[in-house]
Amino acid sequence: MSKKDKKEEIKEEVEATEPTTEESVEEVAEETSENKELQEALERAEDFENKYLRAHAEMQNIQRRANEERQSLQRYRSQDLAKAILPSLDNLERALAVEGLTDDVKKGLEMVQESLIQALKEEGVEEVELENFDPNLHMAVQTLDADDDHPADSIAQVLQKGYQLHERLLRPAMVVVYN
């Protein structure tokens, strides 16, 4: 091989490697552009997935709260009616306490009273317990001095019965308390 041929061969090799370098630079630039687009697409997909999961959790919470509210409404549906009936029940008790009623009238009033009490019990309305004074269930309208026979915070007299619907207080019992 002559020097001329060798120079041409080297020149051809250099020319052959130059386009490869340019092509590889273009390929690398293309790959980084594709990688960048892919990364952005993955970030958007992750963002959408997070938004979907949050929306799904929010819908479940809304459904749970709606169910709880519906159950509460069903459980306490008779609250207003019970509050309206309680004064009538008090009046029946006062009427039964009146002296001079005939036995027939007294028996009729007792039957009406019992039927009202039974209807209220079926709806979950019960009298407030009267063992010891509880400020959550009783309203102290008067106090008396405590002694050996009557310890502090015991109930001396009930002026008006209290009622509760399940665990919700409808009306506190008005009581006289030893203090």
UniProtKB/Swiss-Prot annotation:
Disulfide bonds: none
SUPFAM superfamilies (alphabetical): Coiled-coil domain of nucleotide exchange factor GrpE, Head domain of nucleotide exchange factor GrpE
Source organism superkingdom: Bacteria
Cellular localization per UniProt: Cytoplasm
GO molecular function (one): unfolded protein binding
UniProt biased composition (Basic and acidic residues): 1-14
Bias (Acidic residues): 15-32
NCBIfam families found in the cross-reference section: PRK14140.1, PRK14156.1, PRK14162.1
Family label: Belongs to the GrpE family.
Protein name per its UniProtKB record: Protein GrpE
Source organism of this protein record: Streptococcus mutans serotype c (strain ATCC 700610 / UA159)
Lineage, uppermost ranks: Bacteria, Bacillati, Bacillota, Bacilli, Lactobacillales
